[in-house]
């Protein structure tokens, strides 16, 4: 199996293709990307027969920015007979996967696929039973075994394959299912909530998103991101010349500072989180984020980089490299991740966590 399917946001296929070609090439897994505009997925076809499996094992999925999910597949199954779609699919997977831990029957995230998605949900139950009978799936779901993927691109037309549960997205179609809170000031709140799900392991939430932490929200108005911090019982400095939602001010957890987010300098030395969703050139935002991290003004940060119309992968890569270079120059070990989230549009969300510094900085790193 030499093909890897990567699901992405429709309209960002070129960026997804450029990224996987670049990062696979760095690991000497060479191939080419098949791209169809607004399809919501890319197929990276490796030149060597077993390189698809090698790619999804060796390249950390968390290092990808534009892919929501990935899995290795075989040849396209076409013209599945309506009276028996199951038998050909089972046949394709036998000998490829044994005792898989989960089945996901998926489509690309496009308007055209919505009707197909309804079929996929109904089709999952009988297909799961048949795959268990054939030994392709284990009798019970388990996160310790590979995930079996059946990816429909049209009625009666699908790819079959698998991903590794320790190196994929845990979410169906790579999309966390989040509900908009009725009392949130803006829909942007879902971006930060999704970022927490994507970047922070669930078993670390109690420690890293803890009650009583201090946080800063730069460009906070009207408070969509502040809302997520308040919801986790943090104390928040919300920095913006624009007004904050009264509902947030009434909690008593928010201090509104009428200042420019680019000029604000914190006076506290125990700020755990800084978040930022400002509409500004990505290079300017990246420089500000690097300043906060180098100076030890926060321990972790989540921020958005707005994307230009062209060369979007190159622009993001350049900004992330700049931040990494600044951290390296000052002897700071940090973890950097970036992802175009489901709730992002013409932007990517970045998470940076200071691990330790060679030079004494924050008290919690000494």
From Swiss-Prot:
Principal subcellular localization: cytoplasm
Gene3D superfamilies registered for this protein in UniProt: 3.30.2300.20, 3.30.70.2810, Vaccinia Virus protein VP39
GO biological process: rRNA processing
One Pfam family cited in the UniProt record for this chain: RlmM_FDX
Signal sequence region: none
SUPFAM superfamilies documented for this protein: S-adenosyl-L-methionine-dependent methyltransferases
UniProt-annotated binding residues for S-adenosyl-L-methionine: 188, 221-224, 240, 260, 277
Entries under InterPro entries matching the protein: RlmM_FDX, RlmM_THUMP-like, RNA_MeTrfase_FtsJ_dom, rRNA_MeTrfase_M, SAM-dependent_MTases_sf
Protein EC: 2.1.1.186
Annotated GO MF terms: rRNA (cytosine-2'-O-)-methyltransferase activity
Cell compartment(s), UniProt: Cytoplasm
Superkingdom of origin: Bacteria
Keywords noted in UniProt: Cytoplasm, Methyltransferase, rRNA processing, S-adenosyl-L-methionine, Transferase
Active site: 306
Gene Ontology CC, one term: cytoplasm
Catalysis performed (reactions): cytidine(2498) in 23S rRNA + S-adenosyl-L-methionine = 2'-O-methylcytidine(2498) in 23S rRNA + S-adenosyl-L-homocysteine + H(+)
Annotated domain remarks: Consists of two structural domains: an N-terminal THUMP domain followed by a C-terminal catalytic Rossmann-like fold MTase domain in a novel arrangement. The two domains are connected by a long loop.
Family membership: Belongs to the class I-like SAM-binding methyltransferase superfamily. RNA methyltransferase RlmE family. RlmM subfamily.
Function statement: Catalyzes the 2'-O-methylation at nucleotide C2498 in 23S rRNA. Modifies C2498 in naked 23S rRNA, but not in assembled 50S subunits or ribosomes.
UniProt subunit comment: Monomer.
Protein name: Ribosomal RNA large subunit methyltransferase M
Originating species: Escherichia coli (strain K12)
Chain's gene name: rlmM
């Amino acid at each position: 199996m030499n093909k890897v399917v990567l699901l992405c946001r429709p309209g960002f296929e070129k960026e997804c293709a450029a990224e996987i070609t670049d990062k696979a090439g760095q690991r000497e897994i060479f191939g080419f990307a098949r791209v169809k505009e607004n399809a919501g997925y890319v197929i990276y076809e490796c030149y060597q027969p077993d390189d698809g499996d090698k790619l999804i094992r060796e390249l950390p999925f968390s290092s990808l920015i534009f892919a929501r999910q990935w899995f290795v597949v075989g040849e396209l199954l076409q013209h599945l007979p309506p009276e028996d779609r199951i038998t050909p699919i089972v046949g394709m997977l036998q000998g490829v996967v044994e005792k898989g831990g989960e089945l996901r029957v998926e489509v690309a995230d496009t308007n055209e696929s919505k009707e197909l998605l309804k079929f996929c949900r109904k089709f999952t139950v009988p297909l799961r039973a048949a795959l268990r009978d054939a030994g392709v799936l284990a009798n019970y779901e388990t996160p310790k075994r590979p995930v079996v993927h059946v990816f429909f691109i049209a009625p009666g037309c699908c790819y079959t394959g698998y991903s590794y549960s320790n190196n994929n997205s845990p979410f169906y179609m790579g999309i966390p299912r989040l509900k908009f809170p009725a009392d949130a000031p803006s829909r942007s709140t879902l971006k930060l909530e999704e970022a927490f799900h994507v970047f922070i392991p669930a078993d670390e939430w109690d420690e890293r998103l803890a009650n009583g932490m201090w946080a800063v929200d730069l460009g906070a108005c009207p408070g969509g991101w502040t809302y997520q911090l308040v919801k986790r019982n943090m104390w928040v400095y919300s920095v913006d010349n624009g007004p904050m939602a009264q509902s947030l001010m009434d909690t008593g957890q928010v201090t509104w500072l009428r200042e420019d987010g680019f000029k604000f300098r914190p006076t506290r030395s125990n700020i755990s989180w800084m978040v930022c969703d400002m509409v500004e050139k990505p290079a300017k935002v990246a420089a500000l984020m690097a300043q906060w991290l180098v100076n030890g003004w926060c321990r972790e940060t989540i921020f958005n980089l707005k994307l230009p119309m062209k060369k979007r992968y190159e622009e993001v890569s350049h900004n992330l490299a700049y931040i990494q270079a600044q951290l390296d120059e000052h002897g700071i070990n940090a973890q950097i991740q970036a992802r175009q989230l489901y709730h992002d549009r013409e932007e990517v969300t970045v998470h940076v966590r200071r691990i330790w510094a060679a030079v004494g900085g924050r008290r919690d790193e000494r």
